[in-house]
Curated annotation (Swiss-Prot):
CDD domains: RutE-like. It comes from Stutzerimonas stutzeri (strain A1501) (Pseudomonas stutzeri). It comes from the Bacteria. This is Putative NADH dehydrogenase/NAD(P)H nitroreductase PST_3601. One of its GO terms (molecular function) is oxidoreductase activity.
Length: 196
């Protein structure tokens, strides 16, 4: 059992954290991206499947490849962000299960079941994307998650000939707080939750 984290940590992760669309001209070091992944990879997934794959797009060439895949409303903010993470999932993730979940033959649970593979890969890579957002905030980065892009075009540009498929995008960097709008409302407990 662990003690609750303090209010400052909760503020960093949740109550004071914001979704950013404008970015300061400050690079994110590759070493920080490696540190970020070291935290993300420890988050739980079903049968420790870890199906998410992350492409950290931070070069001009990478952004040029990404740009045609973006919806119009996401183009400028993504090109301005120091890093855009393509959160993908690997449909061959069952092949890693003998290594990642060695105490059971979990790979056999997915044999011949492509729909189950895709369902679990999408669900658990989405979970890992959430870990990435929280880990990034904990490391002093700001985030701007997005789903406005052409998945087929992105997969063709970045993942042709592989078993990887795109799930969502997350812009990373140091947000320009002066460009933030007022926080949007969220649903209260009694409208979003049921005690059963």
């Amino acid at each position: 059992m662990h003690a609750p984290i303090d209010s400052n940590a909760l503020a960093t992760l949740f109550s004071e954290a914001r979704t950013h669309s404008a970015w300061l001209d400050k690079a994110v070091p590759d070493a920080l991206l490696e540190q970020l992944y070291e935290h993300v990879r420890l988050g739980p997934t079903a049968v420790n499947s870890c199906p998410a794959r992350f492409v950290f797009v931070r070069s001009a060439e990478g952004k040029q490849k990404l740009a045609p895949c973006l919806s119009k409303g996401n183009l400028d903010k993504t090109l301005a962000a120091p890093v855009t993470v393509v959160v993908a999932y690997d449909e061959d993730f069952p092949e890693t299960l003998p290594e990642l979940f060695p105490h059971a033959d979990a790979r056999s649970w997915y044999a011949g079941q492509p729909a189950l593979i895709t369902e679990n890969a999408l669900r658990n890579s989405s979970l890992q994307a959430g870990y990435l957002i929280l880990a990034a905030r904990a490391l002093g980065l700001d985030c701007g998650p997005m789903s406005g892009f052409d998945g087929k075009a992105l997969d063709a540009a970045f993942f042709a000939g592989t078993s990887w498929k795109s799930n969502l995008l997350i812009n990373l960097g140091y947000g320009d707080a002066s460009k933030l709008r007022d926080r949007l409302p969220r649903l209260p407990f009694d409208r979003a939750c049921v005690l059963a």
